Amino acid sequence: MNYDVYGTFSSVTGPNSPLNDACAPSGDQQGSAVSAVAAWTAAKFPANKIVLGVPAYGHSYTVPQSTAVTGTTLNIYTAFDKVNIPIGDSWDPPTTTPDICGNPPVGNGNSGIYNFWALIGDGFLGQDGTVASGMVGLFDNCSQTVRP
């Protein structure tokens, strides 16, 4: 499973499910599909028994414009507002109750999670999965992820 490598629990924004992170700054190498498979096979787990799951959702953040971009390039790893987490898609109701581990909700109780269908339905991505017109986005060659 290669889910939630970064999220509202992290200190900075980052790819939810990076395929690779070997070329990310060393402090931002939190794990990836490549490093997970390498670790399991190094531990002698049979490679033909590994099934890799990747999510079809993403996290949203409130990031100040001043740190969101450098020139015209989106910053992948940047600080975000941990209190004002955006509401996610229509399946993301805010909560004020602790999670199953007893941890209080982060920030304002929103998770900021968008399922893939909502990224298209809410206009972040086009029907073909590319960044929608009027949105700023990039394909990160390191993590092999799209950042709308």
Show where each model-derived region lies.
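Substrate-binding surface in catalytic domains of secreted glycosidases
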Residues: M1-V106
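Hydrophobic, secondary-structure "cap" segments at the distal end of domains
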Residues: S90-P148
